Structure formats: C-alpha cells, structure tokens
Amino acid sequence: MNLFVTDQCPVKSAHALDDKRVGKLLMECNQMMSLAIKVHDPFGDWECGPTLLTAGQPHINHPVSIWVRENISNFEWCLSHALELFAEFVLRFDKEHASGHRIPYIASKRSCLPSGELLPFQNSARNAGIGVDYSHLPVPVSYREYLRERWETDKMPVRWTNR
C-alpha cells in the first residue's frame, strides 16, 4: 500500500510512474480512499461493489492509509492522483482500468472527511525484503530513488508507453 509521491503535484506524480505501477497505484488509491470513508462514516449510506467502494478494510493501520484519511486535503490529493492515474492508464493502454469507475462514487462520499490543510506526505519509501530504504530523504526524492532501485530489480524492462 503506497502512493509513490515522486512530486508534490498529484498529476506529475502519476506521470512519473511506469506502466507496471499505473494500474496498481490506481487500485491502491481507491482502497485507501474507500477505507477513509468507511472509517469516518462507518454507518453511512455507502455500498461496496465494482463501481462503488472497495470491500473490506485492507491495510487499515498502514501509515499511508492513515495519512490519506487524516483530513480532506490529504484525501483530495489522493483523489486527484487517482483521477490522473486513470487518465494515464487510458493514454498508455488505450483502454479503461475497471478500478477507475469507482472514482466518481468515492468522490461523492468524501464529505465525511475532517477539514484540514495538506499534511507532510508519509514517507514509506522502503522495502526490507530487498534491502531498500530511502525514507530518510525528502519525500519526492525518496520515492524517485526507491523506484529507480526497484526498476533495476524488475524482471521486465520498465516502460512508459505513449509518454
């Protein structure tokens, strides 16, 4: 569960992701935003389903999930990022990612989030399994370095189709 904040701007951050991660991160954004709604409005008028909220409460205590639900500004950053990830997926693959169809419903339920200014991004740019930890660096730099390192270990060559 992560956002891979390679830039303070959610649009630029989405553009920086390689093909492999565009769809994956779109699904993760939707999971974290769905979780934020469920936590702040546990008895609300919402539903789970293919074009609705995601099911369950995965990664409820992950630091990035907590950051997304901390306030409306953090949630809005994630929402903007998800919208751009969906657009990126269409641009790169000439088809829609099914997870993108959740976004309008998720956006319609965001009023339950508390107000607040955008908080510093959660830095989770580490993976003990492969011995990578850039969490000591400033957030955008840490994620760019983390991804560079991950790309070197990927089995398939990294691609940015139509970019």
PLM ranges: what are they?
Residues 109-163:
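Aromatic-residue-lined binding/catalytic grooves and analogous aromatic/hydrophobic interfacial grooves
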